[in-house]
Amino acid sequence: LGKFEAGPHFLEVGDTFKITTDDILGTKDLVSTTFKGLPKDVQPGDFLLIDDGKVRVEVTEASDTVVTTRVVVAGNVSDNKGINLPGVAVNVPALSEKDEDDLRWALRIGADLIALSFVRDAQDVQRVHFIMDEEGRRVPVIAKIEKPQAVDHLEEIIDAFDAIMVARGDLGVELPLEAVPIVQKKAVEFARRMAKPVIVATQMLESMIDNPVPTRAETSDVANAVLDGADAVMLSGETSVGKYPVQVVETMARIVDSTEEHGLDRIAPLNVTPRTQGGAITMAAVEVANFVRAKYLCIFTESGDSARRMSRLRSSIPML
């Protein structure tokens, strides 16, 4: 969704809500979208899910520029919330015009990382690299795993991109909820095997948007992501719109620190045959270090590849 003149707005069941491709400032009844192909990709009877499925609307009419819907599940809508079309074959490029403009701007101001949304296959990174080459600057590109097509092409995506993010919010809209934990574990396992960083994101401490302490289930969720072997856990709404942004960061850091201190030995060993010389050397180095009870592991690296391959082994010996 685009921006609203005011808001957020609460949509009641039965309300008419229109989405237009025209560039306007939205009201409770009509708002713009950056996805210009939306009217062509939907038809009456299709369902649109807004803000990770918190609001559900049914398409009643689609013209050249406006999609008219009826609210089925009530909720708030506000600036820049995502729209999902589960089961609809969306004809949209990996990068919209705005995405390309934003990418160029990010490169010019010195962004360290770029995350690409709604990746479907390994080819989606090509346009990003083309623009980076035009701008004369390449930085790592993270593939956000949030579409069923991405799950189907997971290994080739991990191979093509520099890192992946398991974006569980959109995944839980596009896939059955019960499938998300398995996809998360599968993605983390594949990324570790291929020595690519993997981030677990979305709704990790969601209740802290409004509360100063998390639920016990959320605490376990963060810890389990660490125990799965994830390289990073990420906050989103908790810090962008939440009431307790500092407390939520401190809370997540405490959970991660405690899990790493007491649970590193619970992370499943990486039972793979190394594919590269760097992989073989780092695996051998960890075995030797454990055998001689070394105090530290020193890693000499220029590209960072050896450090990543050493990190994925999750040794309890500190690394320099």
Task: Indicate where each model-derived feature is located.
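Non-catalytic helical/linker scaffolds that mediate oligomerization, partner binding
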Residues: 1-320
